[in-house]
Amino acid sequence: MAAYQIQSLVGAFKEHYDKDSFMKNLLLDNLLLIDIYEREKQLHIQANAPRVVMLVETQYGRSRDRDRDALVILQGMIGPGSGDFVTQVDENSVVIIHAAESDHADEAVARYADGVLNYLQEEGIQDARVAYGTVVGELKEISHSYKEARMALDVSRIFFEEKDVI
């Protein structure tokens, strides 16, 4: 009985690790289209659901410990049961793949980004910034939303330095 439970835990860990690497490769546009369809079926991910990428970055004090804290805090905020996914693509930023309500949910996405920023501030991370891309309808387009969020964050450093949600 104990061996079966341990085996189940190992399987769940491997599935999460596979999902994490799949999402990272998807964000960075490192997958072929056929691989995307194959892996989404294996990992039980819905392909045609509206999603948006949010990029959370600590503006000052970009130590790894600080960003790791943000990752853990955001994973705790979102939880495993929601349709959202949290990962870290580089050492300075945390990525949230948020399951949007519809393709035209700009106000809801902005409110969610404000909520993420407020939650981080309540948890003691005061220098965070949140940028988000457009809502995309398919999983294969998620890298476009990520690139838009990344560009919004880069441009905001120059033109909108006072804004925390971009």
Predicted regions and their residues:
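Hydrophobic, helix-rich cores of sensory/ligand-binding and other regulatory modules
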Residues: 1-166
